[in-house]
């Protein structure tokens, strides 16, 4: 099966509305798996309620049978290639947003996530074929 990878700001896991369900059902009907890393515009309160599973060597939130959130600091083996994932980013407009409504602190990588990413890369001898990210961090933990 083919994989379609979206690099952040997925937008289909927001509030459980009929709009979310319409698009997730549509994505699930396609002849490929939809994989995404988180961006800085995600509803992390909802996203983090999904079950964590292993998929192609890394941890994911399974959203639907063919829709997966590739979690931060993981390496996935897809079609013979290693993909390292580091989602998130910094919202430049945070001063105009409301926490837990349209902005979440979880958009920024935590120290624990950074440590996990380094450990994962160490286990893979710092050899991956692709790095998937959404945004460049202006700072790090």
Feature map (PLM): residue ranges:
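Core catalytic region of metal-dependent phosphoesterases/phosphodiesterases
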Residues: 1-78
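Active-site-proximal loop/helix segment associated with metal-binding centers of metalloenzymes
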Residues: 65, 79-141
